[in-house]
Amino acid sequence: MTVGKSSKMLQHIDYRMRCILQDGRIFIGTFKAFDKHMNLILCDCDEFRKIKPKNSKQAEREEKRVLGLVLLRGENLVSMTVEGPPPKDTGIARVPLAGAAGGPGIGRAAGRGIPAGVPMPQAPAGLAGPVRGVGGPSQQVMTPQGRGTVAAAAAAATASIAGAPTQYPPGRGGPPPPMGRGAPPPGMMGPPPGMRPPMGPPMGLPPGRGTPMGMPPPGMRPPPPGMRGLL
């Protein structure tokens, strides 16, 4: 059902209405809505009914019941009358105007996470990101803690491989002396002064066949002439 703006029912919305039903009960409440079947919705509704006494000497008494929100069927409705004007909206909080005087409180946005006064935690040295611009910390400060010994050992190993002089621990003697080309091994006598050391194959390689051997060491007789080719 289409209801026009000039309908009398719309003019009584939010009014306190008295509704009388067929069984004699009276409902007084705030009129909120209706439909084409005259079904009504009342809020803050009170029910009033008259109770007949058992004896004729006693008068009728009226009983009141607080119901709240009520839906009334239109088929039971007999009449509707205005009980009072719309109630004032005292319980609804309204937004204050910009020019209105403020109270003692201060309006602030609700904070999320860490409060504003608490300082932010910073990452330890060496674990933070790169510093932009000039004036950042030195490389020693940026080196992660706990890894200095590993880096020093790696640097020492690289230096020894590259040819740096190796330091030997004390108490175990120095490095073995270098051996020259003509120097005899330890425990053997060298050639007398003025004599040339024998020319032989490099150390560690046996003399090949047909290769003339060098001069024998002093004190040893050379092999016979016929035996030289067999060696």
Swiss-Prot record:
Gene3D superfamilies: 2.30.30.100. CDD domains: Sm_B. Residues 172-205, 214-231 have a biased composition (Pro residues). It comes from the Eukaryota. Methylated by PRMT5. Arg-108 and Arg-112 are dimethylated, probably to asymmetric dimethylarginine. Signal peptide: none annotated. Its main location: cytoplasm. InterPro entries: LSM_dom_sf, Sm, Sm_dom_euk/arc, snRNP-assoc_SmB/SmN. Sequence repeats lie at residues 175-181, 191-196, 216-221, 222-228. The modification Asymmetric dimethylarginine is found at residues 108, 112. Pfam families: LSM. Residues 163-231 are annotated as: Disordered. One of its GO terms (biological process) is spliceosomal snRNP assembly. Plays a role in pre-mRNA splicing as a core component of the spliceosomal U1, U2, U4 and U5 small nuclear ribonucleoproteins (snRNPs), the building blocks of the spliceosome. Component of both the pre-catalytic spliceosome B complex and activated spliceosome C complexes. As a component of the minor spliceosome, involved in the splicing of U12-type introns in pre-mRNAs. As part of the U7 snRNP it is involved in histone pre-mRNA 3'-end processing. Belongs to the snRNP SmB/SmN family. This is Small nuclear ribonucleoprotein-associated protein B. It comes from Mus musculus (Mouse). The gene is Snrpb.
